[in-house]
Regions:
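Beta/alpha (TIM)-barrel catalytic core signal, keyed to glycine-rich beta->alpha loops juxtaposed to Asp/Glu
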Residues: 1-149
Length: 149
């Protein structure tokens, strides 16, 4: 697309959440014969990083395309237990931790939170002050059912 337009593309909005990690999975599971090593996104994460295109994550609290929110959802007990455990340690909400998980990625991904509720927005903004450790980030990733090599 950049080849055919005058303006440089600087942002790409993509679905990404703790439960929608395809673009992350394929980069972690390189050269393996497992489902999560299949590149279904055309290496978009790596492409955007190389071309200085900011990824904006839409539906950062959703699982699937239209199924619903994973936070406080009975379908994700291990994930919610891990998020709530870290939230309690850091003194913030589970929403702030889910947002911080996206912000912690080295690609400097920007979440699009899509709320009009001022209190929820203030709560989400606390994520920018949370410093998830690498271990916490991977614990959350694994609690969502993702595997590491």
């Amino acid at each position: 697309l950049n080849k055919y337009i005058d303006e440089k593309i600087i942002i790409n909005q993509l679905q990404l959440s703790i439960t929608n990690t395809g673009m992350i999975d394929s980069g972690l599971n390189v050269n393996m014969k497992i489902n999560s090593s299949i590149d279904r996104d055309g290496s978009i994460l790596e492409y955007c990083r190389l071309k200085d295109i900011t990824i904006q994550a839409w539906s950062p609290f959703q699982y699937g395309m239209f199924e619903g929110v994973f936070l406080d959802n009975d379908k994700f007990p291990e994930l919610n237990n891990k998020i709530n455990e870290i939230a309690a340690i850091k003194g913030v909400s589970n929403t702030a931790i889910a947002t911080a998980w996206i912000l912690r990625h080295p690609a400097k991904i920007q979440p699009i939170v899509g709320t009009t509720n001022q209190n929820r927005l203030k709560d989400i903004c606390k994520a920018s002050q949370i410093n998830l450790t690498r271990q916490e980030w991977y614990e959350i990733y694994r609690a969502a059912g993702n595997k590491l090599p």
